[in-house]
Amino acid sequence: MRLVNLILLLIALVFFVWVLNELGWDTLGHYLWEVGWYWPLLLLPYGVVNAVVSWAWKHIIINPPAKVTVARLFWLRLGGDALNQLTPTASLGGEPFKAVRLQADGVPLEVASASVVIMKGILFLSLTLYIFTGLALAPVFLPQTAKHMLLLSLAALGLAAVGIAFVALQRRGPCGNSFRFLSRRGWLPHFLRDREGFLEDLDTAMSQFYRQYPARAVMSFLLFFLSWLIHAAEVYVIFWLLGC
């Protein structure tokens, strides 16, 4: 496993250097010079955002082992998000990694997998609230956007509907129902044929979370929303330091 981690680290380093080279070392140096010697402070907001999201994730995992701390989730999320960025999987490539590493830390796989799916759903819902907040403030700070407000609001409502449907679906046994639907029609992939029990347990874990721990769901939602606000502050500070 250490060898695999080292290989992945080297690949990530090569990609990182390539990206910087594409941006242009002179251009990068120019912007860093404009910001000043305290430019490393610009990296802090992302760390704060990741810490808040990890805290929210901790609320989703029921009865985690002692070793599953916010700090541990912080690094797991960084690793998973790195895989999301490096693989063409629509930001889903790192999610199995998070679940498997949680299982290695003592969390049952169905609980770990449920936490990842639930986190995606609640994070998406918090994003829609963040978008609606931006739309509410847009006429005040960007009056020129008023003529597009109807279209933007309809798009935001569409996103909210998708998010609500995704979260509501998690309470209705989507994995088991999909398994039986595919099985009846002979479309069930071979690798899923022995996984019905796990899928049923995954459905149970997701449903129980929403039914038995609504306060945890609300707390994680609020923390996710806070993380989006910190993101906004981060962008504002960067542009302010660059004199934009």
Which residues does each PLM region occupy?
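Transmembrane helix-loop-helix hairpins in multi-pass inner-membrane proteins
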Residues: 1-30, 80-189
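Membrane-interface helix starts
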Residues: 2, 34-42, 208-221
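Helix-boundary and loop/linker segments of multi-pass membrane transporters
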Residues: 27-35, 66-69, 105-106, 205-213
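Hydrophobic residues within alpha-helical transmembrane segments
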Residues: 44, 48, 79, 118-125, ...
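Short helix-coil transition sites and intra-membrane helix breaks within transmembrane domains
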Residues: 48-55, 60-62, 85-96
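Membrane-embedded helical hairpins/re-entrant loop segments and their flanking transmembrane helices
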Residues: 52-79, 238-244
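Core segments of transmembrane alpha-helices
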Residues: 123-130, 201-202, 224-235
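Short, membrane-interfacial amphipathic segments enriched in basic
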Residues: 184-202
